[in-house]
Amino acid sequence: MSLELEWMPIEDLKLPSNVIEIIKKRGIKKLNPPQTEAVKKGLLEGNRLLLTSPTGSGKTLIAEMGIISFLLKNGGKAIYVTPLRALTNEKYLTFKDWELIGFKVAMTSGDYDTDDAWLKNYDIIITTYEKLDSLWRHRPEWLNEVNYFVLDELHYLNDPERGPVVESVTIRAKRRNLLALSATISNYKQIAKWLGAEPVATNWRPVPLIEGVIYPERKKKEYNVIFKDNTTKKVHGDDAIIAYTLDSLSKNGQVLVFRNSRKMAESTALKIANYMNFVSLDENALSEILKQLDDIEEGGSDEKELLKSLISKGVAYHHAGLSKALRDLIEEGFRQRKIKVIVATPTLAAGVNLPARTVIIGDIYRFNKKIAGYYDEIPIMEYKQMSGRAGRPGFDQIGESIVVVRDKEDVDRVFKKYVLSDVEPIESKLGSERAFYTFLLGILSAEGNLSEKQLENFAYESLLAKQLVDVYFDRAIRWLLEHSFIKEEGNTFALTNFGKRVADLYINPFTADIIRKGLEGHKASCELAYLHLLAFTPDGPLVSVGRNEEEELIELLEDLDCELLIEEPYEEDEYSLYINALKVALIMKDWMDEVDEDTILSKYNIGSGDLRNMVETMDWLTYSAYHLSRELKLNEHADKLRILNLRVRDGIKEELLELVQISGVGRKRARLLYNNGIKELGDVVMNPDKVKNLLGQKLGEKVVQEAARLLNRFH
């Protein structure tokens, strides 16, 4: 697993001088050991490689060299695939450098019902696994020109949610030239063989990692730390996290603390903030961040106020409940070393590149959602992802990763399980009906008609054991035929019109089946019923429902004005999802009725990030339901769902639909205009002074011009 530490001078690369110049401009004079090894294994000759190495070991530059050398020799296009939108943006900014030598770089994510024909003009495309999967289903011609794929963060194959789509994309991508990049994985030889690639495996890190465990001593407020090399040290403080955080800050380090829930992340951040008076902070830099925070429109007032009080002390929390703009601000403040401590949930470890001198893992247990009162230990991969964030190149000589345990008895076990063990082997996540049926539907959509043998061969190319493929394959074909997603044409299987629409919309076949049954069995219904139906599907958003809240929702069910489109289920799990869907529907109803965002957040106990994600998912599902109802010729439903989709997208009452077509006019500005007598596009054009008065000179002028352009287009 370890490599001889060889550093290759940039000048020794068999690459044109203009390519070498771009790399040099970044201050890189030599390739590090993983990069050197990749070049020695034929990266620049287009050899298929699987590179596994820790976070921060320079994998992106390996991808850049692979793509650029391949395109210079062979022409065509290359696609770089990441599991997260935040990473897509990060990689796009890096790859923009190559426009200096004539390559056109583009980024695409979201909006699954399109073939993105505009990408035919680009050479290097950065996207997500889901987006690429959806593009293949639409069969755009430009995709045939792509002959080099970089599959980033391939260890996401093991992710229960994202794994199936990563595997689906990999099965198709491995039929062409590829470079796969991953965090350290234990069965890398097996995965390399599956990819038809040569493994390049290394544990090299730019900053050495020191791992340890902290536990309480008998003496009050004293904590002992044992490191992997058996050295020890003592720290003092009100609890283990505070003690080690203050110790690291006293050495001018930054600290990333991981907690297992949002509540814990927020309360720990508040606790740490109380001790920051002893830490030297750049108050001017922090007040600059606070000014930027005031300018951010997204986010609830309460979360902004809490963040303000924390950031003023050099601390912040970070989790998916925060809006993207707030998360971005916190990340940038930390990168610039203005914010000293971030307390986050583990999602941060899997996402953007945000190293710190010290990582403190506050919990190795996580609440089990399926069994009340039961806690699971976190996977080893999650521990490695979190600890891998320790040590910032260019700032830190070492990185420290410390796990908090309750007592001395836990120390040995935690060392053996997390510090000294390999991560779990990667296994297929296509082994469920939901994942496997979606996979087959996607293959037929991308490939066109296939014989049973051809379709089966695609399934055999997965990581799933052959016996399991046989079981799922027969079951899937039977179900997809019975539910009219596919049909037999001679000796081949083909998608029905309905099946093709489902594949193009990029929704799960079980979601489509629930929507179809709900619509076909009922006349046009109320908004809440449609929202509830869509939230109840496998693709619907999940939201946390407290016990008291659940009782209130059950009572509310009995008093609804209109009939829901799904019968109450008997099974406990299904019933729980049914209640969850009702909460989502109520949130969306308030959003569409223009209830103030702060009110929604406090009423339903959610974060602004949750609301944004919910709106995005329900926008996609209402759009999909509208198109399915048209396909099924359910015109009454289609009319209702079209309006519902537009209202969900912008969070508006129906009367504002015309105004929000204007770029720069969202729910608040549209309501302001409407309440002041500007109700249609024509009113905007006819009353320019009034519009400028309401929206400000600069924006008002733009809005009037845009309204005039829209009017001309319509007439």
Curated annotation (Swiss-Prot):
Q: Which SMART domains match?
A: DEXDc (SM00487), HELICc (SM00490)
Motif Q motif mapped to chain: 8-36
One biological process term in Gene Ontology? DNA repair
Its EC number is 5.6.2.4
Q: Does the keyword Hydrolase apply?
A: yes
Q: Where does ATP bind?
A: Q35, S53, P54, T55, G56, S57, G58, K59, T60
Which residue numbers delimit the Helicase C-terminal domain? 236-442
Q: Does the keyword Signal apply?
A: no
Q: Which terms are listed as keywords in the entry?
A: ATP-binding, DNA damage, DNA repair, DNA-binding, Helicase, Hydrolase, Isomerase, Nucleotide-binding
Q: Which residues form the Helicase ATP-binding domain?
A: 40-203
UniProt subunit comment: Monomer.
What does the entry's free-text domain comment contain? Crystallizes with 5 domains; the first 4 form a ring through which ssDNA may pass (seen in A.fulgidus crystals). The C-terminal domain (654-715) lies perpendicular to the ring and is able to bind ssDNA, which may cause it to may act as a molecular brake, inhibiting helicase activity.
The UniProt entry's sequence similarity note says: Belongs to the helicase family. Hel308 subfamily.
> Which named protein is this?
ATP-dependent DNA helicase Hel308
Q: Which organism is it from?
A: Saccharolobus solfataricus (strain 98/2) (Sulfolobus solfataricus)
Task: Tell me the organism's taxonomic lineage.
Answer: Archaea, Thermoproteota, Thermoprotei, Sulfolobales, Sulfolobaceae
